[in-house]
């Protein structure tokens, strides 16, 4: 059952909170609205052959935590805890010069990775990735080389993974994998719209290339879910849809909102909060493009298959003649970077996806480990950054259906910018006996009071509500190696006064209600 209709009370809230100010934070349930069962693929992740994400991250045969396949078991255990549903691989920019055939079989060919300008040993290839996914319990999502690769190379890769016949199906069997991998999710290219990408394409080139690649890939696996690199810019995505839309299931959108490519000067907490509305604006622009192209109402869905607040730090200053500053990539590992700002921005991003979950079907946090990842891997174990616990809460605490709500909220201002101080979504189980309301307080120092719509939920008002809260002593708190975690979800009971609940500053809170 993917969609159902529920009648709600249309009674408006008449009371205000104690000590109310001229404007209140008020949550209302939208009457007579359809509830949507969202796709938990929204809680997906991404991994790239960049720096220490794969080698020394999820894969390290020399580690004391390695299993018989060289996979870090502590990483696998942590990912199982947040029930990772899908992982996109191998890139990213890396894939635009990656030729998959060098990464299969007993004899591996080390290659020079022209995208990141290092050697890749190719010891972690297609078969290893899929085996790792099976251990984690997630779906493999393979992004193909549409930079220096060809449509035929892409379809050969599908053949290797999914067939038992032909040259490449037989090659997989000979490599020790008699059963097909049955990879369902495939993307044509990565960011081929950008001048930074090796093998970048023009608008005129991209649509025909995607069309022909998709035709070949579907000739191998007819029911494959196909993606293509797109943007929320109409000038790129509209021509793509006109040429190849009929072959696609998803447009692939990427987003990073704190650009740190060249200079590792992370935005402050309040600056980050001013960016929290940007992802939803991108989603709405993309939806408008899909509708104008005739692919609205879910005919083609949105996959935000790379996203994070902060972009990866890898200085090259726009000039390939200067190369990369390789040692500067270590700055991505600094624990103090990943504060409540990262956690709350990520929660706001997930809320935006869930509000539009009839169209936004998949999202992949970038990356899954190391660099800006939710988990930092080191020789003695792992560190769960603040963003890890956001996924822990969303995956394990939310119910399965989105209940449409409105949120009247006071503004939070900084310089010439402003955003709503609160962001919230409501989820329910199938028969509306359990509710989980997610609310984010973006204010760095002040508590906020929220009026809850008990009447709209057909619930009796209560004096107490159970909650799980993620916060810190300050907005700049972070978790670090060898110390007690400062930012970790805590279960508590909150008081409810005149239908209102008080939320801690810089916090992510999940409130639980039952009939």
Positions of the model-derived regions?
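Active-site His/acidic residue clusters
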Residues: 255-271, 317
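Active-site cores of enzymes that catalyze phosphoryl transfer or operate on phosphate-rich substrates
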Residues: 247-250, 269-274
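Alpha-helical transmembrane segments and their juxtamembrane interfaces
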Residues: 14-16, 316, 451
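Intrinsically disordered, low-complexity domain-flanking/linker segments in eukaryotic proteins
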Residues: 320-325
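Non-catalytic accessory regions flanking glycosidase/transglycosidase catalytic cores in CAZymes
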Residues: 22-235, 241-250, 279-314, 327-515
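Bacterial Sec-dependent N-terminal signal peptides
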Residues: 1-24
């Amino acid at each position: 059952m993917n969609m159902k209709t529920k009648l709600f009370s249309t009674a408006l809230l008449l009371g205000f909170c104690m000590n109310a100010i001229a404007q209140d934070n008020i949550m209302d349930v939208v009457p007579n609205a359809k509830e949507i069962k969202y796709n938990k693929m929204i809680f997906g992740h991404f991994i790239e052959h960049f720096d220490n994400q794969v080698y020394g991250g999820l894969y390290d045969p020399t580690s004391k935590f390695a299993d018989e396949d060289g996979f870090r078991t502590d990483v696998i255990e942590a990912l199982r805890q947040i029930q990772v549903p899908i992982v996109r691989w191998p890139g990213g920019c890396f894939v635009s010069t990656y030729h998959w055939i060098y990464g299969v079989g007993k004899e591996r060919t080390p290659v020079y990775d022209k995208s990141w300008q290092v050697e890749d040993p190719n010891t972690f290839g297609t078969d290893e990735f899929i085996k790792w996914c099976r251990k984690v319990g997630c779906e493999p999502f393979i992004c193909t080389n549409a930079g220096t690769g060809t449509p035929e190379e892409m379809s050969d890769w599908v053949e290797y993974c999914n067939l038992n016949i032909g040259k490449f199906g037989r090659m997989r069997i000979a490599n020790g994998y008699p059963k097909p991998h049955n990879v369902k999710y495939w993307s044509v290219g990565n960011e081929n719209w950008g001048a930074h990408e090796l093998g970048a394409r023009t608008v005129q080139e991209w649509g025909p290339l995607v069309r022909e690649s998709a035709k070949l890939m579907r000739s191998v696996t007819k029911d494959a879910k196909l993606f293509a690199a797109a943007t929320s810019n109409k000038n790129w995505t509209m021509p793509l849809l006109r040429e190849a839309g009929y072959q696609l299931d998803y447009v692939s959108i990427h987003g990073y909102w704190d650009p740190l490519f060249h200079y590792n000067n992370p935005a402050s907490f309040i600056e980050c909060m001013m960016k929290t509305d940007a992802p939803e604006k991108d989603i709405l622009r993309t939806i408008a493009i899909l509708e104008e192209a005739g692919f609205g109402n879910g005919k083609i869905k949105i996959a935000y298959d790379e996203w994070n607040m902060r972009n990866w730090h890898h200085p090259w200053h726009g000039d390939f003649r200067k190369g990369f500053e390789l040692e500067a990539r270590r700055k991505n590992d600094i624990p103090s970077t990943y504060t409540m700002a990262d956690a709350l921005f990520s929660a706001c991003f997930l809320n935006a996806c869930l509000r539009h979950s009839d169209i936004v079907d998949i999202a992949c946090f970038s990356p899954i480990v190391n660099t800006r990842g939710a988990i930092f891997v080191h020789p003695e174990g792992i560190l769960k950054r603040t963003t890890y616990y956001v996924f822990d809460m969303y995956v394990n605490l939310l119910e399965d259906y989105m209940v449409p709500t409105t949120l009247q909220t006071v503004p939070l201002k900084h310089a010439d910018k402003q955003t709503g101080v609160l962001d919230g979504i409501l989820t329910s189980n199938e028969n509306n006996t359990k509710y989980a309301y997610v609310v984010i307080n973006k204010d760095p120092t002040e508590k906020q009071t929220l009026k809850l719509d008990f009447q709209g939920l057909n619930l009796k008002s209560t004096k107490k509500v159970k909650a799980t809260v993620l916060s810190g002593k300050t907005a700049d708190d972070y978790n670090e190696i060898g110390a007690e975690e400062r930012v970790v979800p805590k279960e508590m009971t909150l008081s409810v006064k005149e239908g209102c609940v008080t939320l801690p500053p810089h916090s992510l809170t999940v409130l639980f209600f039952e009939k």
